[in-house]
Amino acid sequence: MERPSIAVLLEAAELQRKKAEDYNNKASRVKQADYYPRGVMSILDIINAKVLRIYSVLEAMENGAKPNFESVEDSGLDLINYASFLVTYMRFELEGQDLNRDIFNRGCDREDK
């Protein structure tokens, strides 16, 4: 029997695949790395915004409100995926990432190209 946490990771991976069809469709010139102009710092900004949203929703739920659109669970799945983008960026493997730039998207001479 598969561990529930592994099932969540697989669900997040499937969500990432489906969202990629919209965010990175083949007819577009926009590459995944274009969403992160400051490299890992941009990804961390998005992760921080997701965490703040979770706090906001949970605080509202404590007072009886329900989320209008994205649930805490949805945000959790997004966090898993943004964490995977962070690691992929750190490994210089993100689609459209310029290998002549560092993890902060600054120009550099990388020795490990």
Residue positions per predicted region:
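Intrinsically disordered, low-complexity regulatory regions
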Residues: 1-113
